[in-house]
Every structure is written in structure tokens, then in C-alpha cells.
Amino acid sequence: MSNPRIRKIADRIQVVVAEMLERRIKDPRLGFVTVTDVRVSGDSQQATIFYTVLGEDDEAARTASAVALESAKGLLRSEVAKQLGMRHAPTLEFVHDALPESARQLDEVLARAKAQDEALAAGRGTAYAGEADPYKKPRPADADEPDDSGEPGEFDGVDDDE
């Protein structure tokens, strides 16, 4: 939505629908619905309204709220048309917003990662951070290692020109 006019229409639709749900729609199936976002098509003929049902985690309450919103769609559309003063009011589509559930799952994953980090940090205090003897010692010459063959282009630490 790069068009500022479309963005203003979307913001106004969000305010009008939220006020209508709070004050004028008295459907008992409608839970505590919060309008989180509104997206309007470029020709302002369709508006997608994202909502959440707060305080109720069961699927039955979500379904009941969705049915209540669908039944109030005509009243909401006529009020949006009246408030916006547009010749053609956009058709409204209600979509349950999954963002709060995703955010909660992400918070749980981050909390588990933090607990694992704290457990690792507690374990680091009891163990050495590396080898028990960190000092370098000369390695014994193994029979498996090839001798210095003196291949040209290979540096053996001795200058051959002298």
C-alpha cells in the first residue's frame, strides 16, 4: 500500500469497524474482538480486516466470533460507507489474525533458548575453557610424516642460496 489515500482509507475503516464492534454490535457470539489491521485493494473495492479474539484460546469461541462477524458484515459495510462518504463502499472480508499465536510460540522458543544458554553458562564455570594443559610442546617426529623432500617452491625454513 504505497498510495497514501489507500492507507488513509484503511486506517479509517479500522477505526470505524472497531468502534462499531465495541459500541453497536451486541451479538452474544462475538467475543472480545480486536481489529489488528486493515488492508485495502488498490482500487478500494475490497477491504480485508484482520482481527483477533483475545482471552479465548479454544477453537469454538473463534468460530463463533467469525460467524458473528460474518452476520454483521452488511451493517458494518453500510456504516463504513456512511462514515467514509465514498460512492462505492469496499466489500469487507474478515480474516483471523494468527500473529499473536505466532508471537507467543516465538516467545516460548526464545525462553527455551535462554534457559539452555543459562544452563550452559552455569556449566562453563565448573569446567576449563580449553585443554587442561594449554602450553605447546614439541611434537615427536612420526614415521608416518614424509621427510623434507626439498621440492622446488617449497619453503623448508633454510635459504638454499647460501
UniProtKB/Swiss-Prot annotation:
Residues 119-162 are annotated as: Disordered. It is found in: Cytoplasm. The keyword DNA-binding does not apply. SUPFAM superfamilies: Ribosome-binding factor A, RbfA (SSF89919). One of its GO terms (biological process) is maturation of SSU-rRNA. GO terms for molecular function: ribosomal small subunit binding. One of its GO terms (cellular component) is cytosol. One of several proteins that assist in the late maturation steps of the functional core of the 30S ribosomal subunit. Associates with free 30S ribosomal subunits (but not with 30S subunits that are part of 70S ribosomes or polysomes). Required for efficient processing of 16S rRNA. May interact with the 5'-terminal helix region of 16S rRNA. Belongs to the RbfA family. This is Ribosome-binding factor A. The gene is rbfA.
